[in-house]
From Swiss-Prot:
Keywords: Hydrolase
E.C. code: 3.6.1.7
InterPro entries named in the record: Acylphosphatase (IPR020456), Acylphosphatase-like_dom (IPR001792), Acylphosphatase-like_dom_sf (IPR036046), Acylphosphatase_CS (IPR017968)
Domain of life where this protein originates: Bacteria
Domain Acylphosphatase-like: 3-90
Enzyme's top EC category: hydrolase
Active site: 18, 36
NCBIfam families recorded: PRK14420.1 (NF010995)
Membership in a protein family: Belongs to the acylphosphatase family.
Designated name of the protein: Acylphosphatase
Catalysed transformations (reactions): an acyl phosphate + H2O = a carboxylate + phosphate + H(+)
Amino acid sequence: MIHYHAIITGRVQGVGFRYFVQGEAVNRGMKGWVRNTDEGHVELKVEGEQQEVLDFLKTVRKGSPFSKVTDMQMEQLPEFAHYQDFRIKG
């Protein structure tokens, strides 16, 4: 199991990007959350099996049909939050 935090920048608000992220996460059995930030970015935290999480993050980096991801900063977190599901916050 691994736990990641990511900040995604680009055209990621107002284009259904959080719903895209949630759908990808749920389809892959990931746990965590995604939300818009006040700065116009999208933030997420995700937990799951290592390869599944890494594949999920690659898909998020590619973006949805209506989004345009220009940057994605990621960090692996040392502790687990034991999320129950994957939800959209805020």
